[in-house]
Amino acid sequence: MTMIACLAERLDISEGQCREFLEGASRKYKSFLIPKRMGGYRRIAQPSKELKRYQRAFLDLYHFPVHDNAMGYVKGRSIKHNASMHASNPYLFKTDIANFFNSIKPQLFWWVLEQLAKKETKSKQAADLKIERLFEALVTEKRFVNELLFWRPGKRSEKLILSIGAPSSPTISNFCMFIFDEHISALCRDFGITYTRYVDDLTFSTKTPNILPGFIHKLREELKICLLGTMDLNLDKTHLSSKAHNRRITGITLTNNENLSIGRKQKRYIKHLVHLFIKGDITEDDFSYLRGYLSYAHYIEPEFVVSLFAKYTCNVMNRIVYRQDY
Protein backbone atom coordinates (compact mmCIF):
# COMPACT_ATOMS: atom_id res chain seq x y z
CA MET A 1 0.00 0.00 0.00
CA THR A 2 1.11 3.55 -0.68
CA MET A 3 1.67 6.03 2.14
CA ILE A 4 -1.47 7.92 1.09
CA ALA A 5 -3.50 4.70 1.19
CA CYS A 6 -2.09 3.75 4.61
CA LEU A 7 -2.72 7.21 6.06
CA ALA A 8 -6.24 7.32 4.65
CA GLU A 9 -7.06 3.94 6.16
CA ARG A 10 -5.54 4.93 9.49
CA LEU A 11 -7.50 8.20 9.61
CA ASP A 12 -10.69 6.66 8.20
CA ILE A 13 -10.88 9.03 5.24
CA SER A 14 -10.69 8.61 1.46
CA GLU A 15 -7.38 8.70 -0.39
CA GLY A 16 -8.64 11.77 -2.24
CA GLN A 17 -9.30 13.62 1.03
CA CYS A 18 -5.85 12.66 2.32
CA ARG A 19 -4.11 13.80 -0.85
CA GLU A 20 -6.07 17.07 -0.91
CA PHE A 21 -5.16 17.86 2.72
CA LEU A 22 -1.46 17.16 2.19
CA GLU A 23 -1.31 19.58 -0.73
CA GLY A 24 0.14 22.63 0.98
CA ALA A 25 0.28 21.00 4.43
CA SER A 26 3.69 22.63 4.99
CA ARG A 27 1.89 26.00 5.27
CA LYS A 28 -0.62 24.85 7.88
CA TYR A 29 1.39 26.16 10.84
CA LYS A 30 1.07 29.00 13.31
CA SER A 31 4.43 30.45 14.35
CA PHE A 32 5.33 32.53 17.40
CA LEU A 33 8.41 33.57 19.38
CA ILE A 34 9.35 32.46 22.89
CA PRO A 35 12.30 33.86 24.92
CA LYS A 36 15.44 31.73 25.24
CA ARG A 37 16.89 31.09 28.69
CA MET A 38 20.20 32.77 27.76
CA GLY A 39 18.66 35.68 25.86
CA GLY A 40 17.16 36.12 22.41
CA TYR A 41 14.11 34.37 21.00
CA ARG A 42 13.25 30.99 19.53
CA ARG A 43 10.60 30.61 16.82
CA ILE A 44 8.09 27.84 17.43
CA ALA A 45 5.98 26.62 14.50
CA GLN A 46 2.87 24.79 15.68
CA PRO A 47 1.01 22.62 13.13
CA SER A 48 -2.76 22.86 12.90
CA LYS A 49 -4.75 20.39 14.98
CA GLU A 50 -5.60 18.34 11.89
CA LEU A 51 -2.01 18.28 10.64
CA LYS A 52 -0.87 17.02 14.03
CA ARG A 53 -3.36 14.18 13.63
CA TYR A 54 -1.81 13.26 10.28
CA GLN A 55 1.73 13.47 11.68
CA ARG A 56 0.89 11.22 14.63
CA ALA A 57 -0.77 8.72 12.31
CA PHE A 58 2.38 8.71 10.16
CA LEU A 59 4.52 7.86 13.20
CA ASP A 60 2.13 5.05 14.11
CA LEU A 61 2.53 3.59 10.62
CA TYR A 62 6.26 3.98 10.06
CA HIS A 63 9.03 3.31 12.53
CA PHE A 64 12.42 4.98 12.21
CA PRO A 65 15.61 3.71 13.86
CA VAL A 66 17.19 5.72 16.67
CA HIS A 67 20.81 5.25 17.72
CA ASP A 68 21.57 3.84 21.17
CA ASN A 69 23.50 7.01 22.06
CA ALA A 70 20.53 9.30 21.37
CA MET A 71 18.92 10.13 24.72
CA GLY A 72 16.28 12.74 23.93
CA TYR A 73 12.69 11.93 22.92
CA VAL A 74 13.30 8.19 23.30
CA LYS A 75 11.12 6.01 25.51
CA GLY A 76 13.09 4.67 28.47
CA ARG A 77 15.85 7.31 28.15
CA SER A 78 16.02 10.68 29.89
CA ILE A 79 18.28 13.48 31.09
CA LYS A 80 19.15 11.26 34.07
CA HIS A 81 20.16 8.38 31.81
CA ASN A 82 22.15 10.82 29.69
CA ALA A 83 24.08 12.24 32.66
CA SER A 84 24.68 8.83 34.27
CA MET A 85 26.58 7.65 31.16
CA HIS A 86 29.32 10.17 32.04
CA ALA A 87 29.28 10.06 35.85
CA SER A 88 32.40 7.90 36.22
CA ASN A 89 34.57 9.89 33.78
CA PRO A 90 36.54 12.85 35.19
CA TYR A 91 37.05 14.77 31.91
CA LEU A 92 34.08 16.31 30.14
CA PHE A 93 33.47 18.15 26.87
CA LYS A 94 30.06 19.66 26.04
CA THR A 95 28.80 21.45 22.97
CA ASP A 96 25.60 21.83 21.00
CA ILE A 97 24.43 22.10 17.40
CA ALA A 98 23.38 25.56 16.28
CA ASN A 99 19.79 26.02 15.04
CA PHE A 100 19.25 22.26 15.27
CA PHE A 101 15.65 21.58 14.18
CA ASN A 102 15.50 24.29 11.52
CA SER A 103 18.74 23.00 9.97
CA ILE A 104 17.11 19.66 9.13
CA LYS A 105 15.74 19.68 5.58
CA PRO A 106 14.11 17.05 3.35
CA GLN A 107 17.39 16.45 1.49
CA LEU A 108 19.03 15.17 4.69
CA PHE A 109 16.02 13.00 5.59
CA TRP A 110 15.99 11.26 2.21
CA TRP A 111 19.78 10.91 2.08
CA VAL A 112 19.91 9.22 5.51
CA LEU A 113 17.00 6.93 4.58
CA GLU A 114 18.67 5.93 1.31
CA GLN A 115 22.11 5.38 2.90
CA LEU A 116 20.69 3.19 5.67
CA ALA A 117 18.62 1.21 3.15
CA LYS A 118 21.73 0.56 1.00
CA LYS A 119 23.76 -0.47 4.04
CA GLU A 120 20.99 -2.81 5.19
CA THR A 121 20.71 -4.41 1.74
CA LYS A 122 24.40 -5.35 1.83
CA SER A 123 24.31 -6.87 5.30
CA LYS A 124 20.92 -8.58 5.76
CA GLN A 125 18.64 -11.21 4.29
CA ALA A 126 15.66 -10.05 2.21
CA ALA A 127 13.22 -10.86 5.03
CA ASP A 128 15.04 -8.43 7.37
CA LEU A 129 15.12 -5.38 5.10
CA LYS A 130 13.02 -3.05 7.27
CA ILE A 131 14.71 0.21 6.20
CA GLU A 132 14.70 -0.82 2.54
CA ARG A 133 10.95 -1.46 2.70
CA LEU A 134 10.45 1.85 4.52
CA PHE A 135 12.39 3.66 1.79
CA GLU A 136 10.39 1.99 -0.98
CA ALA A 137 7.09 2.77 0.77
CA LEU A 138 7.86 6.48 1.07
CA VAL A 139 10.05 7.46 -1.87
CA THR A 140 7.27 7.13 -4.47
CA GLU A 141 5.33 9.85 -2.63
CA LYS A 142 8.26 12.01 -1.64
CA ARG A 143 6.42 15.28 -2.29
CA PHE A 144 3.59 14.37 0.08
CA VAL A 145 6.02 13.11 2.75
CA ASN A 146 7.87 16.43 2.57
CA GLU A 147 4.62 18.37 2.91
CA LEU A 148 3.56 16.24 5.86
CA LEU A 149 6.79 16.39 7.89
CA PHE A 150 8.35 19.77 7.05
CA TRP A 151 7.37 23.41 7.53
CA ARG A 152 7.54 26.18 4.91
CA PRO A 153 8.54 29.24 7.00
CA GLY A 154 7.71 32.00 4.51
CA LYS A 155 4.64 32.74 2.38
CA ARG A 156 6.71 32.85 -0.79
CA SER A 157 9.45 30.52 0.43
CA GLU A 158 10.20 27.25 -1.33
CA LYS A 159 12.43 26.19 1.57
CA LEU A 160 11.23 23.33 3.79
CA ILE A 161 12.63 22.82 7.30
CA LEU A 162 11.81 20.78 10.38
CA SER A 163 9.79 22.80 12.88
CA ILE A 164 10.04 23.03 16.64
CA GLY A 165 6.51 22.16 17.69
CA ALA A 166 5.42 19.35 15.37
CA PRO A 167 4.82 15.97 17.10
CA SER A 168 6.76 14.24 14.33
CA SER A 169 9.87 16.45 14.57
CA PRO A 170 11.58 14.69 17.54
CA THR A 171 11.43 11.29 15.83
CA ILE A 172 12.49 12.64 12.45
CA SER A 173 15.37 14.64 13.96
CA ASN A 174 16.70 11.59 15.81
CA PHE A 175 16.47 9.57 12.61
CA CYS A 176 18.30 12.23 10.58
CA MET A 177 21.12 12.16 13.15
CA PHE A 178 21.49 8.35 13.00
CA ILE A 179 24.49 8.22 10.64
CA PHE A 180 26.24 11.01 12.57
CA ASP A 181 25.58 9.24 15.90
CA GLU A 182 26.88 5.99 14.43
CA HIS A 183 30.09 7.54 13.06
CA ILE A 184 30.83 9.57 16.19
CA SER A 185 30.15 6.59 18.48
CA ALA A 186 32.64 4.45 16.53
CA LEU A 187 35.23 7.23 16.56
CA CYS A 188 34.78 7.72 20.30
CA ARG A 189 35.20 4.01 21.01
CA ASP A 190 38.60 4.13 19.28
CA PHE A 191 39.68 6.98 21.60
CA GLY A 192 38.13 5.62 24.81
CA ILE A 193 35.52 8.40 24.88
CA THR A 194 31.89 8.08 26.01
CA TYR A 195 29.45 9.94 23.72
CA THR A 196 25.77 10.82 24.13
CA ARG A 197 23.43 13.20 22.34
CA TYR A 198 20.37 14.74 24.01
CA VAL A 199 18.55 16.41 21.09
CA ASP A 200 21.11 19.10 20.10
CA ASP A 201 23.34 18.76 23.20
CA LEU A 202 26.46 16.67 22.55
CA THR A 203 28.42 15.33 25.52
CA PHE A 204 31.79 13.57 25.53
CA SER A 205 33.69 12.24 28.53
CA THR A 206 36.76 10.14 29.19
CA LYS A 207 39.12 8.90 31.86
CA THR A 208 42.14 9.94 29.79
CA PRO A 209 43.48 13.52 30.14
CA ASN A 210 44.28 15.79 27.16
CA ILE A 211 42.22 13.87 24.58
CA LEU A 212 39.09 16.03 24.47
CA PRO A 213 40.60 19.47 23.58
CA GLY A 214 41.65 18.26 20.13
CA PHE A 215 38.42 16.40 19.48
CA ILE A 216 36.40 19.42 18.32
CA HIS A 217 38.09 19.44 14.88
CA LYS A 218 37.16 15.79 14.24
CA LEU A 219 33.64 16.51 15.45
CA ARG A 220 33.12 19.39 13.02
CA GLU A 221 34.45 17.23 10.16
CA GLU A 222 31.95 14.48 10.96
CA LEU A 223 29.13 17.03 11.11
CA LYS A 224 29.94 18.15 7.56
CA ILE A 225 30.23 14.61 6.20
CA CYS A 226 27.29 12.95 7.97
CA LEU A 227 24.87 15.88 7.79
CA LEU A 228 25.66 17.14 4.27
CA GLY A 229 27.12 20.38 5.62
CA THR A 230 23.75 21.51 6.98
CA MET A 231 24.83 21.94 10.61
CA ASP A 232 27.67 23.32 12.70
CA LEU A 233 28.56 23.57 16.36
CA ASN A 234 27.53 26.48 18.54
CA LEU A 235 31.05 27.44 19.65
CA ASP A 236 29.69 29.83 22.30
CA LYS A 237 28.27 26.79 24.10
CA THR A 238 31.38 24.63 23.88
CA HIS A 239 32.94 23.85 27.28
CA LEU A 240 35.66 21.63 28.71
CA SER A 241 35.64 20.70 32.40
CA SER A 242 37.03 18.18 34.86
CA LYS A 243 36.57 17.06 38.45
CA ALA A 244 38.38 20.22 39.50
CA HIS A 245 35.42 22.25 38.21
CA ASN A 246 31.63 22.06 38.32
CA ARG A 247 30.50 19.43 35.81
CA ARG A 248 26.88 19.69 34.64
CA ILE A 249 25.06 17.78 31.91
CA THR A 250 21.54 18.76 30.83
CA GLY A 251 21.08 20.55 34.16
CA ILE A 252 22.37 17.69 36.33
CA THR A 253 25.55 17.99 38.41
CA LEU A 254 28.10 15.16 38.33
CA THR A 255 29.64 14.78 41.78
CA ASN A 256 33.26 13.80 42.38
CA ASN A 257 32.12 10.51 43.93
CA GLU A 258 30.42 9.57 40.62
CA ASN A 259 26.84 10.33 41.64
CA LEU A 260 24.17 12.61 40.18
CA SER A 261 22.96 15.71 42.01
CA ILE A 262 20.61 18.65 41.52
CA GLY A 263 23.46 20.88 42.73
CA ARG A 264 24.17 22.88 45.89
CA LYS A 265 22.53 26.09 44.66
CA GLN A 266 19.22 24.33 44.01
CA LYS A 267 19.38 22.50 47.34
CA ARG A 268 19.81 25.81 49.20
CA TYR A 269 16.87 27.31 47.34
CA ILE A 270 14.63 24.31 48.08
CA LYS A 271 15.48 24.57 51.80
CA HIS A 272 14.73 28.29 51.67
CA LEU A 273 11.27 27.58 50.23
CA VAL A 274 10.61 24.91 52.87
CA HIS A 275 11.43 27.50 55.56
CA LEU A 276 9.01 29.96 53.93
CA PHE A 277 6.34 27.25 53.95
CA ILE A 278 6.89 26.53 57.65
CA LYS A 279 6.59 30.24 58.47
CA GLY A 280 3.47 30.57 56.31
CA ASP A 281 5.13 33.14 54.04
CA ILE A 282 5.33 31.13 50.81
CA THR A 283 3.43 32.37 47.73
CA GLU A 284 1.21 30.10 45.65
CA ASP A 285 3.67 30.28 42.74
CA ASP A 286 6.65 29.37 44.95
CA PHE A 287 4.65 26.56 46.56
CA SER A 288 3.83 25.09 43.14
CA TYR A 289 7.49 25.40 42.14
CA LEU A 290 8.60 23.72 45.38
CA ARG A 291 6.29 20.74 44.88
CA GLY A 292 7.34 20.33 41.25
CA TYR A 293 11.04 20.61 42.03
CA LEU A 294 10.79 18.12 44.90
CA SER A 295 9.40 15.62 42.41
CA TYR A 296 12.33 16.32 40.07
CA ALA A 297 14.84 16.10 42.95
CA HIS A 298 13.38 12.76 44.02
CA TYR A 299 13.97 11.46 40.49
CA ILE A 300 17.56 12.74 40.21
CA GLU A 301 18.79 12.58 43.82
CA PRO A 302 16.29 10.77 46.09
CA GLU A 303 18.71 10.87 49.05
CA PHE A 304 18.32 14.66 49.21
CA VAL A 305 14.53 14.42 49.54
CA VAL A 306 14.94 11.74 52.23
CA SER A 307 17.22 14.14 54.12
CA LEU A 308 14.52 16.84 53.96
CA PHE A 309 12.01 14.48 55.56
CA ALA A 310 14.54 13.75 58.31
CA LYS A 311 15.36 17.43 58.88
CA TYR A 312 11.89 19.01 58.64
CA THR A 313 9.79 16.00 59.79
CA CYS A 314 7.40 13.84 57.79
CA ASN A 315 4.47 15.98 58.90
CA VAL A 316 5.86 19.14 57.27
CA MET A 317 7.10 17.43 54.11
CA ASN A 318 3.89 15.46 53.59
CA ARG A 319 1.92 18.70 53.80
CA ILE A 320 4.09 20.02 50.96
CA VAL A 321 4.28 16.90 48.81
CA TYR A 322 0.61 15.94 49.15
CA ARG A 323 -0.65 19.53 49.53
CA GLN A 324 -2.20 18.76 52.88
CA ASP A 325 -3.77 21.70 54.77
CA TYR A 326 -2.49 24.29 52.31
Where is each model-derived feature located?
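Short beta-strand->loop micro-motif that forms the acidic, two-metal-ion catalytic signature
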Residues: 200-207
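Short beta-strand
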Residues: 194-198
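Conserved, non-catalytic sequence blocks in retroelement Pol enzymes and Pol-derived host proteins
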Residues: 169
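Right-hand nucleic-acid polymerase module
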Residues: 1-34, 41-129, 137-166, 175-188, ...
